[in-house]
Amino acid sequence: MDSITKDQHAKMENDFFSSKHEWTWDEKLSTSSIKLSDNNLNVTFHPVYSTGTAVVKGNKSLEKGRHHYWEISMITHIYGTDVMVGVGTANAELHNASERFCALLGQDRESWGFSYKGYLQHDGKTCKYGTTFGQDDLVGIHLDTWTGTLQFFINRKPLGVAFTKLNNIILYPLISSTMAQCVMKLTYSCSISVSLQTTCLTVLSPWQKAYLSKKFPGLRYLIQNIFADILQKSIDYDNEENNVEFPAQYIILDDFDYALVGFGIKKKK
């Protein structure tokens, strides 16, 4: 495997340190039922009283070939017919429920939703998914545009893959609420390129991350990035057999390791 040049490494590092907010909520959709504030990061649904269902869309589509992660803080107590997070296409209907109370995201084939009541919805079909969420919870959403999977997190704990076969579909982040004076804050909206390097992150154990961070300071931008946790597969690392650390002189970097470390390390013969 060819080594990674310093210019390529710098580009990847800049990629990982891109803006904490690559997108915000679309102010063009602001109506009397939706109030945006704090540079369009905060949303207040139905500021006075509610007469139906309101929805907000991200101001940018989610680019293909990337891992996308965004996180929404539930500021207020949640109640009522439904409060949902999810994604939708440009054809997703955003205004047809302004005078009726409903679970809007996932009512048709153009959107996919996760309800605060703990169920998923798409194409009008619902199924039980995970725990409920409410005030002070952080709801995370991870879209892998390469594999076409969408999964949700609550307080950084993964709930498992929710939807599949989302490849080659241009999607936008969506949130909806029927609740009066419901406040949400977009705390993260970031992405990284899908690559062998990011794939390596999915199988690194905590002690391996700590070791690489110590031995290869240039990798800290990668290992200490939020995606190092988001992409982590569910593997039992409590078993001591998995935590054996070999002396450095016996370590040989194979192509898998070399892809992660990049330039500057050569294999021992």
Regions found by a protein language model. Give the residues of each.
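PRY/SPRY (B30.2) beta-sandwich protein-interaction domains
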Residues: 1-269
